[in-house]
Structure formats: C-alpha cells, structure tokens
Amino acid sequence: GSLKRPEDLLGEFELRLLHMFGLKRRPSPGKDVVIPPYMLDLYRLHAGQQLGYPLERAACRANTVCSFHHEEVLEELPETSGKTARRFFFNLTSIPNEESVTSAELQIFPGEQVHEAFESNSSYHHRINIYEIMKPATATSKDPVTRLLDTRLVHHNASKWESSDVTPAVLRWIAHGQPNHGFVVEVVHLDKENSASKRHVRISRSLHQDEDSWSQLRPLLVTFGHDGKGHPLHKREKRQAKHKQRKRHKYSCKRHPLYVDFNDVGWNDWIVAPPGYSAFYCHGECPFPLADHLNSTNHAIVQTLVNSVNSKIPKACCVPTELSAISMLYLDENEKVVLKNYQDMVVEGCGCR
C-alpha cells in the first residue's frame, strides 16, 4: 500500500493511545480548569513521593480515582437554632458503566473564614453531619427526608480538609440505580457546655470570595473504582537494580533509555502529571550461546541453538520481560480530574525470547 504521511501516522498513534486510556476523543479542557489539591496530593503519593496524608486506605483497592465538584446552584436550607445546613448535588453520570466503584469520600474544608467569629483561645467545636437525601423537600414537607451517613467533631481552629465516608449513598446511586438527590451537610456549633450555639460557619462560597480561592476550597466528592484492567493504585516500590558483576557483550540485549515527553505530542494541556516519563526500550543481540543474564526461556535457548546450525531459523528476539505501571493525573472529556494506574508502561527488564 501507499506510504502514510507522518501526520497521519501521528493521528493514528494518538487514537490508539486515547483508546488505551479509555477515552473516545482527545480532551480539550478550558484554560480555567482547577486541579483540586487533594488530587495532586493523591498523585504524589502514588508516584512514590511520601506524604503525611491518610490517603492509602481508600485507594488500595482502586485503579481509578475521579473527583467531582458540586453543581453550584446551592439550595439554602432553613437555618435552625445553632445549625447551618447546605444541600450539595454532584452529577456522577460520567462514571463509565464498566467501572466498579469501591468507595467514595466527601471532602469539606471548613477553612479560616469559617472561624473568624470565634476567639482564638477558646475551645469551641463544630459537629459536622453528612446526610444522604432520600426524598427531596416538597411544597407540603419543607424538610427533605434524610439518612445520616457520617458525623465528626471538629475544633473551630482546625483549618484542614475533613473527609467523610459516603460510600453507601454513592453505591445506592450508581450500582443500584437509586435516584441521586445529593447530600445535606449540616454544621452544628457547640459552645463550652457542648450545647448548640448560633455562631455561623460557612461551608459555601462567600459573597466576595474570588474564583481562585473558592475553587481551591470548594467541596469535593471523590470516587475510588476499578475498571477491571490491571492492578490497583498503590505506592510504587522502587525496584532495586540487581548489580551483578558480569561480562556483558557490548551489543547484547539490554534496556536503553527512552523518555516520552507529553509536550512533544501536544498533550500537556490535558495530562496534568507527569509531564512525561521514562518508558525505556529493549535492544541488542541474542548471541549463541545465550548467557544467563539474558533472561531467556528454554524455547529461546533451543531456537538460538538451531539458528547456530541453520541460519534460516531466526535468532531469539530482545524483548521486555518485565513491565511496570505508571500513575497519571489527567482531565477527561468532561473536564473531570482523574487519577489512573496504567499497566505495562515502563520496561523494567529485557531478555531474549
């Protein structure tokens, strides 16, 4: 057939890679998409950079992590004595059917602006209650019917993300097809006697808060799932190279450096991290007799032996014998931030096969 032009080959290569990533088309995210700090922390953890976050538990059975911001048409719920409540709805329809969700967390940041009403040396606490809405409020019943999912006691000075397990609700919506009416997040303010006080806590965007600071602190729903391909996300143990002193032929089969730069293929607008990675490749001769370090099979040894007396039979080939995964943080077609483990992306060892 006719030779393909380089740009056609590149387009075909891009389509194959997108298919490998489970994407139907190349994502084209807007310039103002914000990557939640939690997702960056999770990526750093799984890329082997140590962190002091308890992120390991939820991700240990998952190979895909997705984050969702709530739909910002916030429904105010009537404030009762000493309580602040908000409804948060997260649209989860972009989770693929083949993905099995194993757990879900609701991340809330009751940040510094929340606590300005309190004296710095006082010992006030808030209780944060997370409810699933079973039936939304109606004209006749002003309050929604809810079910408590999680509750936690938070000191008013604690400026950190609070994570609540909302797995039962998300599984009901996704796996069992129940209607998703969202969550109610209720903050109960407790004074020194642990009775409810009327101090106000903000869990939604303030009137004058700029887009950038709000986007860093807005609530986040994080789902952990597995698409049935490859291994779960986990901290990658750095392999210790086995340095045995052995005589190697200069041209014998071995691993060579190969760095894949996502900038070169113009993908750095939707791949958040890493900017590229060391894929390596295998190249070199498989000479007769095959040395032990060439990591050969019995079949390769027999084939090489036959080749030494009959050159019509090809030599064994230098190929990857061990491959490892990489973690990638990227924006999908719906501008959702996804962390995923991709199998067989890095050559760890080569041999004659």
UniProtKB/Swiss-Prot annotation:
Pfam families: TGF_beta, TGFb_propeptide. One of its GO terms (molecular function) is cytokine activity. Residues 228-248 are annotated as: Disordered. Residues 231-248 have a biased composition (Basic residues). GO terms for cellular component: extracellular space. The gene is BMP2. Belongs to the TGF-beta family. It comes from Gallus gallus. Negatively regulates the structure and function of the limb apical ectodermal ridge. This is Bone morphogenetic protein 2. It comes from the Eukaryota. Homodimer; disulfide-linked. Keywords: Chondrogenesis, Cleavage on pair of basic residues, Cytokine, Developmental protein, Differentiation, Disulfide bond, Glycoprotein, Growth factor, Osteogenesis, Secreted. SUPFAM superfamilies: Cystine-knot cytokines (SSF57501). Disulfide bonds join 253-318, 282-350, 286-352. InterPro entries: BMP2_TGF_beta-like, Cystine-knot_cytokine, TGF-b_C, TGF-b_propeptide, TGF-beta-rel, TGFb_CS. Residues 1-239 form a propeptide. GO terms for biological process: cardiac epithelial to mesenchymal transition; cartilage development; ossification; positive regulation of epithelial to mesenchymal transition. It is found in: Secreted. Its main location: secreted. Glycans are attached at residues 91, 121, 157, 295. SMART domains: TGFB.
